[in-house]
A protein has these predicted regions:
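Short, surface-exposed ligand-recognition loops at beta-strand->loop->(often short) alpha-helix junctions
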Residues: 11-18, 61-66, 114-122, 156-160
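Short proline/glycine- and acidic-rich turn/helix-capping motifs at secondary-structure junctions
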Residues: 48-52, 85-99, 143-150, 179-191
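Non-catalytic interaction/regulatory modules that flank or connect domains
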Residues: 24-28, 32-55, 63-71
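Short amphipathic alpha-helices in soluble, non-transmembrane regions
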Residues: 22-26, 68-79, 126-130, 164-173
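Short, low-order "capping/linker" segments at domain edges
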Residues: 93-111, 118, 125-126, 156-160, ...
Length: 191
């Protein structure tokens, strides 16, 4: 027993709500190998790039060595085509940092840095408070071992939803900084 790392790359049809479904599925993963230890998401990387498919890089802690192939198979059975990349050095050392870039599909995108509490349900709270008409166009989270997680989120929010979006941010209660006008965002990510 101990903490092991599993990394998977999951793909699904690009439709609103699929990221939330993936997160719910991950939070409900069964135990493979008898361990009762809770899994934690250590990393999420995503950028909208295709109207038909989404590619999400997910890192998880596991309690049993060799669990990653079972996790990948489980996610695939639930309609998330998944590749176990636990032993793929190219993916783990380089590609994980290159997820993203400019996207012509990210219309009406607002970019925000959030401080998520490191506790179960924090991400699902965020997702459940979002309006179904808003779309996550970018998501980057990496566990740094603190009691909070720095998260960068791109949300497609129609201009007419400004008041509702402000209410969402207030109700959520997580500290945030809007970066939509940041010149680095405009240079590297905004289409």
């Amino acid at each position: 027993s101990g903490d092991w790392s599993s990394d998977v790359c999951s793909s699904d049809l690009e439709e609103r709500g699929s990221f939330r479904r993936l997160c719910e599925l991950i939070s409900d993963l069964p135990s493979f190998g008898g361990s009762k230890a809770q899994r934690n998401v250590t990393e999420f990387n995503y950028r909208i790039s295709d109207a038909q498919r989404a590619h999400v890089f997910v890192g998880l802690t596991t309690a049993v060595r060799g669990e990653s192939d079972k996790i990948a198979a489980y996610l695939s059975r639930h309609k998330f085509e998944t590749i176990d990349i636990t032993h793929d050095d190219l993916a783990k050392e380089h590609i994980r940092h290159m997820v993203g870039g400019r996207s012509t599909l990210a219309q009406d995108e607002r970019l925000l840095r959030f401080i998520f509490p490191e506790r179960p349900g924090a991400l699902l709270k965020f997702l459940s408070l979002m309006r179904p008409t808003w779309n996550i166009s970018l998501f980057h989270y990496r566990n740094q071992g603190a009691d909070y997680g720095r998260t960068l989120v791109g949300l497609q929010v129609p201009k007419g939803d400004k008041r509702a979006f402000d209410e969402f941010l207030s109700t959520l209660g997580y500290p945030y900084v809007e970066e939509t006008d940041n010149p680095i965002y405009r240079a590297f990510l905004q289409a």
